[in-house]
Curated annotation (Swiss-Prot):
Subcellular location(s) of the protein: Cytoplasm; Nucleus; Cytoplasm, Cytoskeleton, Spindle
Subunit record text: Component of the elongator complex composed of Elp1, Elp2, Elp3, Elp4, Elp5 and Elp6. The elongator complex associates with and stabilizes microtubules; efficient interaction requires the full complex.
Listed name of the protein: Elongator complex protein 3
Domain Radical SAM core: start-end pairs: 84-374
Gene Ontology BP annotations: cytoskeletal matrix organization at active zone; establishment of mitotic spindle asymmetry; hemopoiesis; instar larval development; locomotory behavior; long-term memory; regulation of photoreceptor cell axon guidance; regulation of transcription by RNA polymerase II
Family: Belongs to the ELP3 family.
Gene that encodes it: Elp3
GO molecular function, one term: phosphorylase kinase regulator activity
Loss of function: phenotype: Pronounced larval developmental delay and death at the pupal stage with delayed and reduced ecdysone-induced transcription, developmental of melanotic nodules and up-regulation of stress-induced genes. RNAi-mediated knockdown results in lethality at larval third instar or the late pupal stage. RNAi-mediated knockdown in sensory organ precursor cells abolishes central spindle asymmetry during asymmetric cell division.
Organism per entry: Drosophila melanogaster (Fruit fly)
Domain N-acetyltransferase: 398-552
GO annotations of cellular component type: cytoplasm; cytosol; elongator holoenzyme complex; microtubule; nucleus; spindle; synapse
Length: 552
């Protein structure tokens, strides 16, 4: 039997690569016209071997070669990791420079489980990171320069086929608010400048130009600790355009916080939650099951307490099961047999039980750290812990009803389902000294979430002058689904179909008629202020606000 003749004989590797990419694009267009599903990896391998190439072309090279008139058709099929923008936003994680943890001065040491930092085995890494996480490696390559980190990541997402019309920053790398004010201003200024292309003299100028930028900064998330989430820190973060706080809690038990050397009390956690929510922030926390002195039952009890006690009840959660990493105090306890991690199956059971407890207004952002497995001596043994936990829940007949699982974009990617009958659903609850209302547009039959709004009646304890008196605040407005550019309207996508406007109208009605408020404020990302201006809101300090008295 004759061997199949290879095409492109006599051509250079680069020339054959061009032919391969051209043929892949043609095949994808044919499949689209025939309304057929295609296994892209298999197609790439077959076409590459046909031309005698030992490896398939990179996705970024294929995306770059797609003709302009075919981009709308092919980019959704070629997009790498579509989950990255399924929520409607491109997340850009950046890291500040390595610095020591601030509570070393008080307690003499860092938390027992914490890797990284200038004094650790991973000395060029930031506190609580090893330097081998994808975000850490990008930051190290850019020498922790915020401008370069942003530009490189935005460019990378574009090359992978994602729309970066809306960007949300996550400032990682330990407690950002303990760094000198001058450095913080430089860092935030450069994040905004990287999107707008303007070279600003200060944060206020950077924010002003960022408002008009083509790539919108729709929010900034800052990682902090309860003791660096006081009034002055909250006000500084508002001036940066920050809309969400990630607060390290780890445990709701006072004895565990003490024994792991957290350097703050559980009471400080509750106070920081109330201060943050009364200033309009979304609150996301980091929680660590499997810490020393906590068994399986006690872990379950702490999450029941966390979700049911109004002193906690955050808007979002990152579940980070404890990892034993070389160079930490916990590593020494583990080596001498004084600490033992849960077996893998028990950890999957625990996470499944935690996910079953999550209320429908809370979003679980992550279920494990991004630390490479070879650096982990003991702890999580699976890289797909969330998927295993969700599979275990299916076996047990329970479901996870958190925001992320129900998002329309995630449902389209994972389950290929789209909402059929959408209706407005309202949930009220008490949290952190205030009345919270969670409004959402959902398909209740399929349990799919299209958009949400978090409304809070400001408590009398709020310290921000803009929110004093009879005032309510919208802490979050988000319509889910793949990113749609701010001025575009795609009838197959859920963003920009008017759901946001309808949610705001209902929030105004509740604030006026039920809260008895005369003013409604919104904590808005810098790039979305014009959206609220169209609805009659005006800049009021760091907020957008509007009078909602009856005669208006």
């Amino acid at each position: 039997m004759k061997a199949k003749k290879k095409l492109g004989v006599g051509l250079s590797r680069q020339e054959r690569q061009v032919l391969v990419i051209g043929e892949i694009i043609q095949e994808l267009l044919k499949a689209h016209e025939a309304k057929k599903d295609v296994n892209l990896n298999r197609m790439k391998s077959l076409v590459a071997s046909k031309y005698g190439l030992d490896s398939s072309p990179r996705l970024v090279d294929i995306i770059a070669a797609v003709p302009q008139d075919a981009k709308k058709i092919l980019l959704p099929k070629l997009r790498a990791k579509p989950i990255r923008t399924a929520s409607g936003i491109a997340v850009v994680a950046v890291m500040c420079k390595p610095h020591r943890c601030p509570h070393i001065n008080m307690t003499g040491n860092i938390c027992v489980y914490c890797p990284g930092g200038p004094d650790s085995d991973f000395e060029y890494s930031t506190q609580s990171y090893t330097g081998y996480e994808p975000t850490s490696m990008r930051a190290i390559r850019s020498r922790y320069d915020p401008f370069l980190q942003t530009r490189h990541r935005v460019e990378q997402l574009k090359q992978l086929g994602h729309s970066v019309d809306k960007v949300e920053f996550i400032v990682m790398g330990g407690t950002f608010m303990c760094l000198p004010e001058e450095y913080r201003d430089y860092f935030i200024r450069n994040l905004h400048d990287a999107l707008s292309g303007h070279s600003s003299a200060n944060v206020a100028e950077a924010v002003r130009y960022s408002e008009k930028s083509r790539t919108k900064c729709i929010g900034i998330t800052i990682e902090t600790r309860p003791d660096y989430c006081l009034k002055r820190h909250i006000s500084d973060m508002l001036s940066y355009g920050c809309t969400r706080l990630e607060i390290g809690v780890q445990s709701v038990y006072e004895d565990v916080a003490r024994d792991t050397n957290r350097g703050h009390t559980v009471r400080a956690v509750c106070e920081s939650f109330q201060l943050g929510k009364d200033a309009g922030y979304k609150i996301v926390t980091h929680m660590m099951p499997d810490l020393p002195n906590v068994d399986f039952e006690r872990d379950i009890e702490q999450f029941i307490e966390y979700f049911e006690n109004p002193a906690f009840r955050s808007d979002g959660l990152k579940i980070y099961p404890t990892l034993v990493i070389r160079g930490t105090g916990l590593y020494e306890l583990w080596k001498t047999g004084r600490y033992k991690s849960y077996p893998p199956s028990m950890l999957v059971d625990l996470v499944a039980k935690i996910l079953a407890l999550v209320p429908p207004w809370t979003r679980v952002y992550r279920v494990q750290r991004d630390i490479p497995m070879p650096l982990v001596s003991s702890g999580v043994e699976h890289g797909n812990l969330r998927e295993l936990a969700l599979a275990r829940m299916k076996d047990l007949g329970t479901t996870c009803r958190d925001v992320r699982t129900r998002e329309v974009g995630i449902q389209e990617i994972h389950n290929k389902v789209r909402p059929y009958e959408i209706e407005l659903i309202r949930r009220d609850y008490v949290a952190n000294g205030g009345w919270e209302t969670f409004l959402s547009y959902e398909d209740p039959e399929q349990d799919i979430l299209v958009g949400l709004l978090r409304l809070r009646k400001c408590s009398p304890d709020t310290f921000r002058p803009e929110l004093k008196g009879e005032c309510s605040i919208v802490r979050e407005l988000h319509v889910y689904g793949s990113v749609v550019p701010v001025n575009a309207r795609d009838p197959t996508k859920f963003q920009h179909q008017g759901f946001g406007m309808l949610l705001m109208e209902e929030a105004e009605r509740i604030a006026r008629e039920e809260h008895g408020s005369t003013k409604l404020a919104v904590i808005s990302g810098v790039g979305t202020r014009n959206y609220y201006r169209k609805m009659g809101y005006q800049l009021d300090g760091p907020y957008m606000s509007k009078s909602i008295e009856e005669n208006n």
